[in-house]
Amino acid sequence: MPEITIDPTTRIEGHHGTTLQVEDGVVQEAKSEMKMFRGAEIITLGRPPTDAAQITGMVCGVCFLCHRLCSSKAAEDAAMNAGVFDGPPRNAVLLRDAAEGIFYLWNHAVHLFALVGPDYSDAVAGTGFDRLDPLEGDGYMGAIENQRKLMKALAEFGGRAPHPVGYVPGGLAVQPDASTIASVKSRVMEVSNWLGPTEAVPEVIENVQNGEFDPELGEGLHDIVSILVAAAEAGAADIGEGPNRYYSNGIFEDPDTGDLFLPRGVYRDGSVELMSKDEIVEGITEDTEYSWYTDDSGGDPRTAKPPEPDLDKEEAYSWGKAPRFDGESMEVGPIARLVIKEADPFDLREALGGGAAESNTLNRLIARAQEALLVRDQVVEWLDAIDPAEPFMADDWTDDFTGRGVGLFEPSRGALSHYMDVENGQIEQYQIITPTLWNLGPRDGEGQPSILEEALVGDEVDNVDNPLNVMRTIRSMDPCLACAVHVQGPDGEFEAEVEPVRPGMSEGGCDV
């Protein structure tokens, strides 16, 4: 059976490849391969709990805020379990909500316009949507301008962005005044005006389908809808079909009730199961059968030791582990959060993607766009609820305790969890399970493929030099890995090398 290797697979960073077994132009089997050992957990050992937020915040330059906040939540949970901490102040909860909401807007724009949008642009796919063209399209450049505004907003609270320093266990290390909050709100409103009104979505869809453009309805909204229309016309609803199992840690906590705007739970067997934090934690395990790690690096992440490499495993093919919930693979990300919330604004996934809970390449894009609009409409409310005269930092925070804690969080890519074991003020054990592990990990010991490995089966490969549908499926899961792409053919030779795409570029590379 012919074999194709695509390595790396995304437009930034690298360290992920996919090997496909193809027969009669259709993918029969896929292996998702993470190519780099990281071991960030090991660096935290022997340090005070507060240090973990500083260290793990550097795990990723994209999800920088998310790891920092998740680690802070793990430390806070451990301290509360030890009986030495009562929880962060109300202002800290609201500001974390607002900051993560701003991050969602920024990251969703990065994904839709820079990471996956070019796959549906005129320059890459001949769709006629030249506003999406990388580097030259008006929509692409407008998104970059508005992403910058959101990063500036995050920097006002965190001191800098990426890698802010203001968010710490116990709350916020700075005390934003009314003028700072107003400045952040002003930047968010500028981006909101670029996006346009949520209620205009049906009209904008009709405009895009008719080749019309009304900037008064929001330039950003027009371009996002263009991506969705181009994807629908390209048949994205018929590729990347997953098992329709979803999991979310939930996010955006109400400081008064503890309710989550995007709820915690799973979707399986056609129904939503809302869950407590303890129920979620109890259900999660990691499998290392096909990972270059020792067996005791897997299992229950609360007690497993930090990852220890094992390079002698003959059948291993990934530095990623295989997370499972109750023994099953689970898809995470915007579609998981909205399915569990039972939200399908304007019935877009139902109408265009074959069903609100259907896992496919198109619905992943639709859900991301829907979520951006949902969260946008909440961020200003969270900012308005902050009282700058009240504290942002708990006065009882201390690193001097013994306890175990778990931080559950939801970066834009999906479920993230940090596990921390503290002994006499020093970290004894640390584990991280990222969204990309859930979606793009390897098989488990039962032979069960990851979400990506399952979703790629059945995708057509019309051209080995340009497997565009395969790339669209991989990128729809927003893997946090990537850059220039190499496509390897059945004879082991590189058939094509893909350079960073510029509009109109074709010689020397294939536009994927």
Question: What positions do the PLM features span?
Answer:
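Active-site bordering "gate/hinge" segments
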Residues: 1-413, 434-512
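Short glycine-rich, acidic/polar surface loops and turns
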Residues: 417
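Aromatic-rich beta-strand edge motifs centered on tyrosine
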Residues: 421-422
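Mixed-charge (Asp/Glu-Lys/Arg
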Residues: 425
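Catalytic-core signal marking the mid-to-C-terminal active-site face
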Residues: 428
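Catalytic activation segment of kinase domains across protein kinase-like and atypical kinase folds
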Residues: 431
